[in-house]
Amino acid sequence: MSLRFEFIQVAMGLRERLSAVPSVHEWQVLFEFCKRQSLLGVGFAAVEKLHEVGVECPADIRLKWYGYALKIERMNEKLNMQCGEITKRYEHDGLRCCILKGQGNLLNYPESLRMRRTPGDIDLWCITPPSGLSMPNATLRDYTNYHGINAVIEYVRMQYRLQGIDANPKACYHHIDAPSMDGTKVEVHYRPAFLRSPLRNWRMQRWFEHHADECMKNKTHLGFSMMTSSVNVVYHMCHLYTHIFEGGVGLRQLMDYYFALRVWHNDVMECKDLQSQGMWSEGLGTPVMSAQEVMAVIRSFGMGKFVGAVMFVINEVFGGANENEKGQRRTWRKTDGGPQADFVGKRESSEFKQILNGGPQADDGGERKLKRINRELKENNFAPWMICEPNEKEGRRLLDEIMKGGNFGQYDTRDAALKKGGMMKHGIWKLKRVMRLVRSYPEEALWEPVFRFYHLLWRMIHR
């Protein structure tokens, strides 16, 4: 196992120590790795834990690391307060709100890591009441009643006018930038996620509309709402899938999903206990979705293969076989993420017998076939909180993208001149990236250019 992955597992409490003591150079590599993946705060927890068992990080690296960790803790305190403030203000004005990603994810982390998660901006999912919102127009003299997405967009633009900011923010298909709060970027979402395929996207929007009410009511002790655990597991998979086509994802997003899965699985177990007592669960009487139900929803969005890839990466990086992973574990045998095979095919069985009996295939070629058969028969554990079997083939591709690109693909040097060029060059870069994904996710990739044109028209209408 990679020393970098072991280091992250130590930070998460999944492993007590590393398999080898890092050299000074390796400590620098670990620091840069955590920096690229936006895991510096979490990584410093590993530095502290290793110090307790006598493994010392060089003083200069440790001091620099500590500075980053302290800054991250203060940023989390600030954003927690701001999330409560903006939720209170928006709800007072008639909107219903729910924090997405970011500070909502923070509550899924264990107490020891909660304030060490690297924060980003504030993402707020807002919906309007059925009666709409009555707001002053641009002249601030007459009032107009707005409904649905238009109401959210106009409300955000009104915030700029009320604060005296001369700006006309451009609305995207799923969100619009609101005025920042003391330097913190705020994105107001009227759609929590989206897909390029029209049919899949229609299904997704309908599903989130159906579950919006339970999320808006799911209040936390920090003064804002967050998604229920079942909806969160689906939403985060949609979020990861979207960013794969945008620029990439990093291990910070995969760690968010790991802890979201753990919280969801705990709720599933608690739900079973409560149902056996004739009670309901998930806060508001909403039943917690089972793994089969979660996968049915995700497959209806066309993301079945991608889920298997994510499960492989999580199993490889966070949830692999380590000394502290608890609970009964299921098994998977095939490397392509397909259905579990409980027997070897007739041809492989015949080859296997010939090799064992010293038959004509018991040569170098036979040895290779024997190794292949053993590899196919080998049982690999995966944790009970996973929602499907890992897909090794797609998972290795995804992990390679993550390691090359870092957080949201910011460190990806492939076609850098195109990526950082003008609008035309950036469009070519994006098309090349999408075409790399055609083999793995053909439906979404082939709809991407069409959606891009549709999005241009949509923005012209809503500017």
How would you label these PLM feature ranges?
Residues M1-G120, C126-G132, P136-E270, G278-R329, ...:
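Conserved NTP-donor binding/palm subdomain of two-metal-ion nucleotidyltransferases/polymerases, i.e.
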Residues P339, E348-E351:
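N-terminal leader/targeting signatures
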Residues M279, P339-Q340, P360-Q361:
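Intrinsically disordered, low-complexity proline-rich tandem-repeat tracts
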